[in-house]
UniProtKB/Swiss-Prot annotation:
Protein origin, superkingdom: Eukaryota
Protein name: Small cell adhesion glycoprotein
Presence of the UniProt keyword Disulfide bond in the record: no
Biological role: May play a role in epithelial cell-cell contacts. May play a role in tumor invasiveness and metastasis formation.
Membrane topology: Single-pass type III membrane protein
Record's subcellular location: Cell membrane; Cytoplasmic vesicle membrane
GO cellular component terms, semicolon-separated: cell junction; cytoplasmic vesicle membrane; nucleoplasm; plasma membrane
Family: Belongs to the SMAGP family.
Post-translational modifications: O-glycosylated. The O-glycan is modified with sialic acid residues.
Xref: InterPro entries: SMAGP
Chief location of this protein within or outside the cell: membrane
Keyword Transmembrane recorded: yes
Amino acid sequence: MTSFPTTPPPAEELMATTILQATEALSPEAEASTALIAVVITVVFLTLLSVVILIFFYLYKNKGSYVTYEPADGEPGAVVLMENDSAKGREKEEYFI
């Protein structure tokens, strides 16, 4: 029987991943600063979210509507009246420089 060369088992250091390795505990000051950073990020995010929601509701309620002065289909004389009104307005325009 021929013996095949075998590879040595990997070292203990190579088998352990960073997840399985023990981590050292953070100091109370580091934990407090981490919590403070998390709170600040959360407050900023909630503020931005509320501003976006307020803008959305404002734009939704104030969609805006416009009034057109187009005559109905049965009123051909209304077009002539509108043209005369706009011509009168042009004569009285004054430009201040």
